[in-house]
Amino acid sequence: MARLAGVDIPNEKRIEIALTYIFGVGRTRAKETLAATGISPDIRVKDLTDEQLITLRDYLEANYKIEGDLRREIDADIRRKIQINCYQGQRHRKGLPVRGQRTKTNARTRKGPKRTVAGKKKATK
């Protein structure tokens, strides 16, 4: 397995798909990278030369934030929003959806499993 940006890239896949294993690189960015470096998107990772791997690594590191740097930046943005107490920060703090989604129903992924709340007791006569 080849390593790019600290990630093991699968040997049997086409390089266009294999690059998407790197956090911060999707299909579009993979295509742009391959076009800029002049590498065919149809070539398999196992068929890449060391020179091509070095070219890819250098291009990705020079032009994009990927893996650890990107994760740190995202975490810092969330921490900043929480600290300045903006609406999105409040939603992050409470563990609720941040971008205006409804919460009366759905939002179970963000809110976690249902917690049953006791209803009103029947009044005895």
UniProtKB/Swiss-Prot annotation:
<dbReference type="InterPro" id="IPR001892">
    <property type="entry name" value="Ribosomal_uS13"/>
</dbReference>
<comment type="subunit">
    <text>Part of the 30S ribosomal subunit. Forms a loose heterodimer with protein S19. Forms two bridges to the 50S subunit in the 70S ribosome.</text>
</comment>
<dbReference type="GO" id="GO:0005829">
    <property type="term" value="C:cytosol"/>
</dbReference>
<keyword id="KW-0689">Ribosomal protein</keyword>
<feature type="region of interest" description="Disordered">
    <location>
        <begin position="90"/>
        <end position="125"/>
    </location>
</feature>
<protein>
    <recommendedName>
        <fullName>Small ribosomal subunit protein uS13</fullName>
    </recommendedName>
</protein>
<dbReference type="GO" id="GO:0015935">
    <property type="term" value="C:small ribosomal subunit"/>
</dbReference>
<keyword id="KW-0687">Ribonucleoprotein</keyword>
<dbReference type="GO" id="GO:0006412">
    <property type="term" value="P:translation"/>
</dbReference>
<dbReference type="Pfam" id="PF00416">
    <property type="entry name" value="Ribosomal_S13"/>
</dbReference>
<keyword id="KW-0820">tRNA-binding</keyword>
<dbReference type="InterPro" id="IPR027437">
    <property type="entry name" value="Rbsml_uS13_C"/>
</dbReference>
<dbReference type="InterPro" id="IPR019980">
    <property type="entry name" value="Ribosomal_uS13_bac-type"/>
</dbReference>
<comment type="similarity">
    <text>Belongs to the universal ribosomal protein uS13 family.</text>
</comment>
<comment type="function">
    <text>Located at the top of the head of the 30S subunit, it contacts several helices of the 16S rRNA. In the 70S ribosome it contacts the 23S rRNA (bridge B1a) and protein L5 of the 50S subunit (bridge B1b), connecting the 2 subunits; these bridges are implicated in subunit movement. Contacts the tRNAs in the A and P-sites.</text>
</comment>
<dbReference type="GO" id="GO:0000049">
    <property type="term" value="F:tRNA binding"/>
</dbReference>
<dbReference type="InterPro" id="IPR010979">
    <property type="entry name" value="Ribosomal_uS13-like_H2TH"/>
</dbReference>
<keyword id="KW-0699">rRNA-binding</keyword>
<dbReference type="GO" id="GO:0019843">
    <property type="term" value="F:rRNA binding"/>
</dbReference>
<dbReference type="GO" id="GO:0003735">
    <property type="term" value="F:structural constituent of ribosome"/>
</dbReference>
<dbReference type="InterPro" id="IPR018269">
    <property type="entry name" value="Ribosomal_uS13_CS"/>
</dbReference>
<keyword id="KW-0694">RNA-binding</keyword>
